[in-house]
Amino acid sequence: MLKLIIPTIMLLPLTWFSKKRMIWINTTTHSLIISTIPLLFFNQINNNLFSCSLSFSSDPLTTPLLMLTAWLLPLTIMASQRHLSNEPPSRKKLYLSMLISLQISLIMTFSATELIMFYIFFETTLIPTLAIITRWGNQPERLNAGTYFLFYTLVGSLPLLIALIYTHNTLGSLNILLLTLTAQELSNTWANNLMWLAYTMAFMVKMPLYGLHLWLPKAHVEAPIAGSMVLAAVLLKLGGYGMMRLTLILNPLTKHMAYPFLMLSLWGMIMTSSICLRQTDLKSLIAYSSVSHMALVVTAILIQTPWSFTGAVILMIAHGLTSSLLFCLANSNYERTHSRIMILSQGLQTLLPLMAFWWLLASLANLALPPTINLLGELSVLVTSFSWSNTTLLLTGFNMLITALYSLYMFTTTQWGSLTHHINNMKPSFTRENTLMFMHLSPILLLSLNPDIITGFTS
């Protein structure tokens, strides 16, 4: 793991010692080189933990998420160039340092083998994210969004710390591998039920589960482009990863406790999809779309079958790339029209035909059209939920219909129609932007050729 962690840490001195003209080139190039390192972890002999040390290791569940995290840093740096064009060099370097430190803490969270280490890095991701949202957001409401983000995350994760201390006192170890191998069957008592809630609540807030999701649209809407991309693509996946790791240890209690949360996530999936149809703010629509997709992941994880876990991992990777792509496209609109209101950016297809092509592909990926990897993830979850209970087919099928509706609504509102009067001097799409969209879309399409590498434990 150190061969990934140390080069990422070395990006910090590189950023601060780079010349004014070379900041973007140096950081983008080196982070792109670093993003190839997780490819080494894919070639593992078997499904056991591939340990390089006692503290950090990777396995088939961790590796796809590490790859996603590493791949996203150069993309966020590329996307932020226009946003920071008027900032002095010291501020640019500080912004990049925040992104790099966030990447370091994410890599360490995904690869930590000790649960207390996992908890520390899980909380550490909060600091750079909060700084990015509250310092570099566009509107004054960003402070309110930062408060929501901090409050929800901290309140959700304090019970997790108490549960971890309790487990350590009882069992004497918090090593994930040891706990998985030596876990006792937990009986269905009040104390154990509360412990299960304490363990999973932090991750349900992070996913977020419907009802605990109010911080997400606020944070997404107020965050700068890099904040939105990292938040949608990787930070939400921390919740899914934590749930997959810990619900296995807490079995068979998970099977008893899962029912209310399964019902809530299935209900929330339809509710948030329906909310998307009524949105006027483009970033808010994409944020609610994220909640809807992650509700499907919660459902898959709580069903607790190998196939559902596979579907959850594939869906997390697919959603990470798709939602990040949609935020990039929304940002390219915002940089030209200076508004997030969809109706004010209508008719852009006539001015930016290539950007309209990326919008079409992103919308189709969002509604899980073949040959994207999204389809495979949704089908796996759909089949699993159907085998768990036949009635879920009605809910998931209805959700897929609404997803198709709001994806097409988003595309038609922003691209079709007559141009508004305030758009008089529109800059053409830059090579940087087109490269950015291509780098998001190519993994979505290429992974469908060999989805084996991101199917998690069950490959």
Swiss-Prot record:
As for membrane topology, the entry says: Multi-pass membrane protein
Q: Does the keyword Electron transport apply?
A: yes
A single Gene Ontology CC annotation of this entry is: mitochondrial inner membrane
GO terms (molecular function) for this protein are: NADH dehydrogenase (ubiquinone) activity; ubiquinone binding
| Subcellular location(s) per record | Mitochondrion inner membrane
One GO process term, biological-process aspect? mitochondrial respiratory chain complex I assembly
Give the InterPro entries listed for this entry: NADH4_N, NADH_Q_OxRdtase_chainM/4, NADH_UbQ_OxRdtase, ND/Mrp_TM
> Main localisation, per the record?
mitochondrion
Q: Which UniProt keywords apply?
A: Electron transport, Membrane, Mitochondrion, Mitochondrion inner membrane, NAD, Respiratory chain, Translocase, Transmembrane, Transmembrane helix, Transport, Ubiquinone
Q: Which reaction does it catalyse?
A: a ubiquinone + NADH + 5 H(+)(in) = a ubiquinol + NAD(+) + 4 H(+)(out)
Alphabetized Pfam families for the sequence: Oxidored_q5_N, Proton_antipo_M
Q: Which domain of life is it from?
A: Eukaryota
Complex and partners: Core subunit of respiratory chain NADH dehydrogenase (Complex I) which is composed of 45 different subunits.
What family name appears in the similarity comment? Belongs to the complex I subunit 4 family.
The record's function comment reads:
Core subunit of the mitochondrial membrane respiratory chain NADH dehydrogenase (Complex I) which catalyzes electron transfer from NADH through the respiratory chain, using ubiquinone as an electron acceptor. Essential for the catalytic activity and assembly of complex I.
The molecule here is called NADH-ubiquinone oxidoreductase chain 4
Q: Which gene encodes it?
A: MT-ND4
